Curated annotation (Swiss-Prot):
Gene Ontology CC entries for this record: cytoplasm; cytoplasmic dynein complex; microtubule; nuclear pore
Family classification: Belongs to the dynein light chain family.
Organism whose genome encodes this protein: Kluyveromyces lactis (strain ATCC 8585 / CBS 2359 / DSM 70799 / NBRC 1267 / NRRL Y-1140 / WM37)
Leader sequence residues: none
GO molecular function, one term: dynein intermediate chain binding
SUPFAM superfamilies assigned: DLC (SSF54648)
The protein's name in its UniProt record: Dynein light chain 1, cytoplasmic
Primary location class: cytoplasm
Pfam families tied to this protein: Dynein_light
Length: 87
């Protein structure tokens, strides 16, 4: 299994590590990108409070607004992950 490769972030190291762990678990247990994203979002909503947004895929563009300190963009293998929280 590939390790996460960080591309951009505005997040604490602790929260980044939690998201990396959740994402690695999700890719090991689910095949569909939608299922991977749903797992990560549901876990973060419970552990960090709502309202999280998770986008997972091989090809997408984005332009989002996020809460300060709650944004991370990274890859695991060929999959890109965009994870952020809004108020």
């Amino acid at each position: 299994m590939s390790k996460p490769v960080l591309k951009a972030s505005d997040i604490t190291d602790e929260l980044r590590d939690e998201i990396f762990e959740l994402s690695s678990n999700a890719t090991a247990n689910y095949k569909l990108e939608r299922e991977i994203a749903a797992y990560i979002k549901k876990q973060l909503d419970v552990s960090q409070g709502e309202t999280w947004h998770v986008i997972v895929g091989k090809n997408f563009g984005s332009y989002v607004t996020h809460e300060k300190g709650y944004f991370v963009y990274f890859y695991i293998g060929p999959l890109a992950f965009l994870v952020f929280k809004t108020a």
